[in-house]
């Protein structure tokens, strides 16, 4: 049996799609030192190469890819989107605007100076900012008719040039951002690691190595005379056992009767107490605890330790600092804080926002009581609410179809903005109503990433046929423009953050990377700083930047 692979690929669009995806993802996993291409650029390069060999199919059939991607971006941003305009989020919003306004202005100017067309200028900006939403917003503006091209301009060539400009400039954008993140603090004779350590010391944040997470364990002790002398007749509230030991007294047996103590309890000799705490807290217990006989009793030790992810929902909690939660009063232990899928350093001054996820452990009833006070326990079901997902997707498309006329000019939102609005709404409602619109994070990530990669395959195959011609004519111009657009906005944002906002350099670098929505650079900077402190800044700008990048793509294609 003779199988002609070339013919098979040219005749089977679905097979071609997944072959390009598989090859691109394989290339994306290749690592040179600490440098990795990333899945989107790996798939795009593969698609351009396959397109140059003559493989193609109708890119319009792959519009579902970018529609799913932008809808999922909206869902992820929803819980934190509105909060970004409140509190200290205004600083982060300013940094995002500095990056975007300067990038759009420079892209417009360099595009005209180098004679780049609509597609190349906008694609170059998307790559220089390492921001796929720019590409998505521009393509949708063209497809929806929002951006009307002048007579004589080839629509298909503009679409092709979007992907070519993006592919040429992406590596410039990624490498320059990583280099600037390391170089700019050094020019001020500041060390990123020292800046991160300064914040950690000021705010009482442990390093990643110091915050190894364990489940609390239960041990029981019989109260002896030495412990009675130590308590000096004080009740549990006055003693503050947790403040001094890191453990909570969850249960007491007195005269054979088990009880859950309140703050008014006074320990008596012969009491048997069950302590809940991390292993290292038990190891550090005062000798007055350990000198009493340790008790191994099934009923006394029969406490159900639970670890749950609690989503912040309460209006009374959102906007408060972590220290104001007083978790010790609930007998609970905080293991992690996650915002916008980024693990945040556990710092007492961090301001909580709706949608934040607190990973909390402790006795089960107390964890659930805490969850009722501040929000709800994240659903662990793997079943998605597809009805809500599809309904809001439909609403997004309908929003995009709405048009308005001013005289002879007619324009509409387009699918990208419409789906962003509906996605943000679904994400916001999900953060406030736990049983509504639930989509497991893994499913959301897969849908978003697959949608993005399918979109990349479509534009890559479409543009690949003329890739050599584009590179020989405009390749060096695109690279030069990309360098300018990548570097100058970062420098401007750094100067604003350092000298106007007076931000800590570790937080500032993280915020700039978030404004560029560049996850790979964030990983490198965290490694360089030997801390997750920059993630605080990244989470502050990432959500709003993802949304405004899409709008910037639309604006750029309108200006070009």
Swiss-Prot record:
Membrane topology listed for this record: Multi-pass membrane protein
Residue intervals passing through the bilayer: 8-28, 37-57, 66-86, 94-114, 161-181, 386-406, 409-429, 451-471, 478-498, 539-559
Source domain of life: Bacteria
Localization terms from the record: Cell membrane
Keyword terms: Cell membrane, Membrane, Repeat, Transmembrane, Transmembrane helix, Transport
Alphabetized Pfam families for the sequence: Asp-Al_Ex (PF06826), TrkA_C (PF02080)
Gene Ontology process terms (BP): potassium ion transport
Family: Belongs to the AAE transporter (TC 2.A.81) family. YbjL subfamily.
Protein name in the entry: Putative transport protein VF_0889
């Amino acid at each position: 049996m003779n199988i002609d692979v070339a013919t098979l690929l040219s005749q089977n669009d679905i097979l071609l799609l997944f072959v390009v995806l598989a090859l691109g993802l394989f290339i994306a996993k290749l690592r040179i030192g600490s440098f990795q291409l990333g899945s989107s650029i790996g798939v795009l390069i593969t698609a351009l190469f396959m397109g140059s060999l003559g493989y193609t199919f109708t890119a319009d059939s792959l519009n579902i890819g970018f529609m799913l991607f932008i809808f999922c971006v909206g869902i992820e941003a929803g819980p934190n989107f509105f909060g970004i305009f409140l509190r200290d989020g205004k600083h982060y919003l300013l940094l995002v605007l500095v990056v975007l306004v300067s990038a759009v202005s420079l892209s417009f100017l360099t595009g005209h100076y180098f004679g780049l067309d609509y597609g190349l200028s906008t694609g170059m900006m998307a790559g220089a900012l390492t921001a796929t939403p720019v590409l998505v917003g521009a393509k949708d503006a063209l497809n929806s008719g929002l951006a009307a091209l002048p007579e004589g301009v080839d629509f298909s060539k503009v679409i092709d040039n979007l992907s070519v400009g993006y592919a040429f400039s992406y590596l410039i954008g990624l490498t320059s951002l990583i280099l600037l993140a390391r170089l700019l603090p050094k020019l001020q004779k500041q060390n990123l690691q020292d800046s991160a350590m300064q914040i950690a010391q000021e705010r009482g944040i442990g390093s990643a190595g110091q915050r190894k997470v364990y489940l609390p364990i239960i041990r029981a002790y019989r109260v002896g005379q030495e412990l009675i002398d130590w308590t000096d007749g004080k009740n549990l509230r006055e003693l503050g056992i947790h403040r001094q030991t890191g453990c909570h007294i969850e249960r007491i047996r007195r005269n054979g009767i088990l009880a859950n103590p309140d703050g008014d309890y006074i320990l008596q000799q012969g009491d048997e107490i069950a302590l809940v705490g991390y292993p290292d807290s038990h190891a550090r217990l005062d000798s007055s605890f350990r000198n009493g006989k340790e008790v191994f009793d099934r009923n006394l030790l029969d406490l159900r330790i639970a670890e749950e992810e609690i989503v912040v929902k309460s209006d009374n909690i959102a906007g408060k600092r972590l220290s104001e939660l007083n978790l010790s009063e609930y007998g609970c232990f905080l293991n992690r804080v996650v915002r916008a899928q980024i693990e945040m350093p556990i710092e007492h001054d961090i301001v909580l926002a709706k949608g934040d996820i607190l990973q909390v452990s402790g006795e089960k009833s107390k964890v659930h009581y805490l969850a009722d006070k501040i929000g709800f326990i994240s659903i662990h079901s793997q079943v998605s609410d597809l009805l809500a997902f599809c309904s809001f997707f439909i609403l997004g498309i309908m929003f995009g179809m709405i048009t308005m006329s001013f005289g002879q000019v007619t324009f509409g939102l387009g699918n990208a903005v419409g789906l962003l609005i509906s996605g943000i709404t679904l994400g916001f409602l999900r953060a406030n109503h736990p049983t509504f619109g639930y989509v497991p994070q893994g499913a959301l990530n897969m849908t978003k990433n697959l949608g993005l990669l399918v979109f990349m395959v479509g534009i890559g195959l479409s543009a690949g046929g003329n890739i050599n011609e584009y590179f020989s004519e405009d390749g060096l111009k695109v690279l030069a423009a990309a360098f300018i657009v990548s570097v100058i906005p970062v420098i401007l944002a750094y100067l604003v953050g350092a000298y106007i906002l007076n931000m800590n350099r570790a937080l500032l670098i993280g915020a700039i990377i978030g404004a560029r929505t560049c996850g790979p650079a964030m990983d490198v900077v965290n490694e360089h700083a030997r801390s997750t402190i920059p993630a605080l800044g990244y989470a502050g700008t990432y959500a709003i930047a993802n949304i405004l990048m899409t709008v910037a793509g639309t604006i750029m294609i309108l200006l070009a």
